[in-house]
Amino acid sequence: MRKPVMAGNWKMYKTPAETIAFFEKFRPLVEKSSHCEIVICPPFTNLAAAVDAVRGTSIRVGAQNVGWAKEGAFTGEVSGPMLNAMGVSHVIIGHSERRQYFNETDETVLKRTQAALEFGLTPIVCVGELLADREGGRTEAVLAGQFQKGIAGLTEQQFAKIVIAYEPVWAIGTGKTATPEIAADTHRAIRGQVREKFGKEAADAVRILYGGSVKPDNAKVLMGQPEIDGVLVGGAALDPVSFASIVNF
């Protein structure tokens, strides 16, 4: 059975002091939540505070991006070894906002994913379609293209260590949410692509998260779909009570 991953993406919010305050409220609310893996991904400036705040718990800390090189003249980038040395365990790669605003491509997603794995991080690799793709019936084709260019280049051993997050771009920060049935159907299609490339065992094992306006009032019904193995939460993960409610669906 696949253990759910409940991940929070803080994007560009909170200071280190606010991070500490969040965990002071959040930790007691999830101390018995052994049914899932909890990962919180704050901005780079808050990683040290977050790692200190979760010490002694099962809560994991993730980054929101990782450089594809070990070191070098890459202004603004943070490498896998740097994150690993801080105690970071996960990293979000290929989020739609990275693709939209910073020209992230499927090819750079693959490079970052390979680097994360090389340096001991668990990648949460994001895929998703635009509203025009959904309305035009191109969802599966778009996701297949992202999979082929951004994920299929991994070896079987590498693929076994990643988590996939399906984030319909039209549902991020809009208040719109894919119905549980639409989300499950899309997850099923992604799992089918995994089966074709990496085999049935890999398809049965990989965890596919849903991300797109996840809130306390829809988390339970989303998690009731057998194809959905967790969630990648944005705005609702900024509030400790709200995110704890999602974790404890």
Curated annotation (Swiss-Prot):
SUPFAM superfamilies: Triosephosphate isomerase (TIM). Its EC number is 5.3.1.1. Pathway: Carbohydrate biosynthesis; gluconeogenesis; Carbohydrate degradation; glycolysis; D-glyceraldehyde 3-phosphate from glycerone phosphate: step 1/1. One of its GO terms (biological process) is glycerol catabolic process. The keyword Isomerase applies. Homodimer. Involved in the gluconeogenesis. Catalyzes stereospecifically the conversion of dihydroxyacetone phosphate (DHAP) to D-glyceraldehyde-3-phosphate (G3P). Belongs to the triosephosphate isomerase family. PANTHER family: TRIOSEPHOSPHATE ISOMERASE. This is Triosephosphate isomerase. It comes from Solibacter usitatus (strain Ellin6076).
